């Protein structure tokens, strides 16, 4: 390809809406253009890199026996209603109606569709296991699309689904996917970790995330020197709970005008934040639930949804709270509330004489105690675990680092096959629901994650395995230099090198800056040293080699550098 013909409009300044390096660099380097919030067009350079990422993923899927298919983006609502996720999935699901007023969704994932697909095709244990996968666009109506392609509303994903007649068979395939995903990351060249994770809206028995480390990653990874690593959505709290060893005092309702937040209440009443209990109201498929957590701890919403088994759970709106309870948000509490399930974090078991909302505007209760003043229906671990708190494996202090989730694998079990009544005949002639697994990989997220992890002040640093072009030939001389550059370009092409020649009529400075910005792994400069029979090879990370201006010598050096 000739740079003079390449559609790669580079920018000299960062876009105004760019929040993180990858979002800025992919636009500046001419890889993507924003069409709407969370919606991007991938330009030729990005498409080349995406295809290379896809090919690595495809090779690893084929290696473990997965078979590629392609399913429709649009899915009928009946499948999702049947599985129970039409309402559970939440507002991220993009719903629409056709001209006949039938409900559809733009698929955020394909568990329902693939389960229905095999319903009348896989009917005997002799046909199992089977693993199917696709690489296709997905749609999720993110409440706040941000960070460019890392959290987009339309994105490219590889999703795979396996069907089994035993848990042992699922375990075997699950292990193969763990190994395949690790190979994908190693082939691309990213620093990563594998963590225990929450199953979220997908559901299932067990799940793991594959996370690339990045300063601006959305995932907070807690890890330990012993080898343990987990998402902060999943890590259990293993610290000690503070025991309030004191006598119970008489409960009082005190006036707290315009005091709503934990910090304001603590300051107004002159108490420590740890003596306050936060009362949070959520609404799910079974109605309202009140959740209690210590004032000095943060609620882990993913733990709460997993514990209640309700992915539709949402924080109740202030106007609904006022209408249904007659109390403004900020003054809710467990004392005197009725017809609401109360779930509390385990840390509250050991508290005495604490502060809660007074169920009356501008009032709080002090000296509240369990059993005497209210009852908790269920106890659970509901708080966010912080760095420095004990590792659940060895007890040593946890450390933290941010990362970007690229892959997520799940042991679904019979979650979908049972609800959708999809069965096979086992060895004993009995009809049984399939045991399933699902395995996602963010293709377009990988594009952003690579840039997020591998860049410098000058631009992107593409690994050779996924660079849009491995080599750029930069001509900065006159006719003799141009003639040799053309000859070298054709020679390298014939030898299978993925090469671009920068034949534009622009200054050498512009060519060098664009080469660094775009991030080609290797630049061959044919310039002033050519008169002495030399050319310059410069790696993107800085190593410079002056070699003989001979095609075979150059090819040998190029191949050696690209294989390192």
From Swiss-Prot:
It is an enzyme of class 6 (ligase). It is found in: Cytoplasm. GO terms for biological process: prolyl-tRNA aminoacylation. One of its GO terms (molecular function) is proline-tRNA ligase activity. The keyword Disulfide bond does not apply. It holds the Pfam family tRNA-synt_2b. It catalyses: tRNA(Pro) + L-proline + ATP = L-prolyl-tRNA(Pro) + AMP + diphosphate. Keywords: Aminoacyl-tRNA synthetase, ATP-binding, Cytoplasm, Ligase, Nucleotide-binding, Protein biosynthesis. It comes from the Bacteria. SUPFAM superfamilies: Class II aaRS ABD-related, Class II aaRS and biotin synthetases, YbaK/ProRS associated domain. GO terms for cellular component: cytosol. Transmembrane segments: none annotated. Its EC number is 6.1.1.15. InterPro entries: aa-tRNA-synt_IIb (IPR002314), aa-tRNA-synth_II (IPR006195), aa-tRNA-synth_II/BPL/LPL (IPR045864), Anticodon-bd (IPR004154), Anticodon-bd_dom_sf (IPR036621), Pro-tRNA-ligase_IIa (IPR002316), Pro-tRNA-synth_IIa_bac-type (IPR004500), Pro-tRNA-Synthase_IIa_type1 (IPR023717). Its main location: cytoplasm. Homodimer. Consists of three domains: the N-terminal catalytic domain, the editing domain and the C-terminal anticodon-binding domain. Catalyzes the attachment of proline to tRNA(Pro) in a two-step reaction: proline is first activated by ATP to form Pro-AMP and then transferred to the acceptor end of tRNA(Pro). As ProRS can inadvertently accommodate and process non-cognate amino acids such as alanine and cysteine, to avoid such errors it has two additional distinct editing activities against alanine. One activity is designated as 'pretransfer' editing and involves the tRNA(Pro)-independent hydrolysis of activated Ala-AMP. Belongs to the class-II aminoacyl-tRNA synthetase family. ProS type 1 subfamily. This is Proline--tRNA ligase. The gene is proS.
């Amino acid at each position: 390809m000739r740079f003079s013909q390449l559609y790669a409009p580079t920018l000299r300044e960062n876009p105004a809406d760019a929040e993180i390096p990858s979002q800025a660099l992919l636009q500046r380097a001419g890889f993507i253009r924003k069409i709407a919030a969370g919606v991007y067009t991938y330009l030729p350079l990005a498409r080349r890199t995406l295809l290379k990422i896809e090919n690595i993923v495809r090779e690893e899927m084929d290696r473990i026996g997965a078979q590629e298919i392609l399913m429709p983006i649009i899915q009928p609502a009946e499948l999702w209603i049947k599985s129970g996720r039409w309402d559970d999935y939440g507002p991220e699901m993009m719903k629409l109606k056709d001209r006949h007023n039938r409900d559809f969704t733009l698929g955020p994932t394909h568990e329902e569709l693939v389960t229905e697909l095999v319903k009348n095709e896989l009917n005997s244990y002799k046909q199992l296991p089977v693993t199917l996968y696709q690489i296709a666009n997905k749609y999720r109506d993110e409440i706040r699309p941000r960070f460019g392609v890392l959290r987009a509303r339309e994105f490219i994903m590889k999703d795979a689904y396996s069907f089994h007649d035993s848990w042992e068979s699922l375990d075997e395939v699950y292990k193969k996917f763990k190994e395949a995903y690790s190979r994908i990351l190693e082939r691309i060249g990213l620093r990563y970790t594998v963590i225990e994770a929450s199953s979220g809206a997908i559901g299932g028995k067990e799940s793991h995330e594959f996370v690339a480390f990045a300063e601006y990653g959305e995932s907070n990874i807690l890890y330990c020197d012993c080898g343990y690593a987990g998402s902060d959505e999943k890590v259990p709290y293993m610290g000690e709970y503070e025991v309030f060893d004191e006598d119970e005092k008489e409960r009082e309702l005190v006036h707290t005008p315009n005091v709503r937040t934990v910090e304001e209440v603590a300051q107004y009443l002159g108490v420590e934040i740890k003596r306050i209990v936060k009362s949070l109201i959520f609404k799910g498929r079974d109605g309202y639930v009140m959740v209690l957590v210590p004032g000095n701890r943060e609620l882990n919403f993913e733990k709460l949804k997993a514990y209640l088994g309700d992915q539709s759970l949402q924080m109740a709106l202030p106007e609904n709270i006022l209408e249904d309870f007659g109390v403004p948000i900020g003054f809710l509490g467990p004392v005197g509330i009725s017809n609401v399930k109360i779930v509390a974090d385990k840390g509250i078991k050991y508290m005495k004489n604490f502060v809660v909302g007074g169920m009356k505007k501008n009032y709080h209760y002090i000296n509240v105690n369990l059993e005497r003043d209210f009852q908790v229906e269920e106890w659970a671990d509901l708080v966010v675990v912080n760095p420095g708190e004990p590792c659940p494996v060895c007890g040593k202090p946890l450390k933290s680092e941010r990362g970007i989730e690229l892959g997520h694998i799940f042991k679904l079990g019979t979650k979908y096959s049972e609800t959708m009544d999809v069965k096979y005949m086992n060895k004993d002639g009995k009809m049984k629901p399939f045991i399933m697994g699902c395995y996602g990989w963010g293709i377009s997220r990988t594009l952003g994650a690579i840039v997020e992890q591998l860049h410098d002040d000058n631009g992107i640093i593409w690994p050779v395995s996924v660079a849009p072009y491995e080599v750029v030939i930069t001509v900065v001389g006159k006719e003799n230099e141009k003639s040799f550059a053309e000859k070298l370009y054709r020679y390298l092409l014939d030898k299978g090198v993925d090469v671009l020649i920068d034949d534009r009529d622009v200054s050498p400075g512009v060519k060098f800056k664009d080469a660094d910005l775009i991030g080609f792994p290797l630049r061959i400069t044919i310039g002033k040293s050519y008169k002495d029979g030399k050319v310059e090879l410069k790696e993107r990370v800085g190593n410079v080699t002056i070699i003989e201006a001979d095609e075979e010598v150059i090819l040998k050096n190029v191949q050696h550098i690209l294989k390192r």
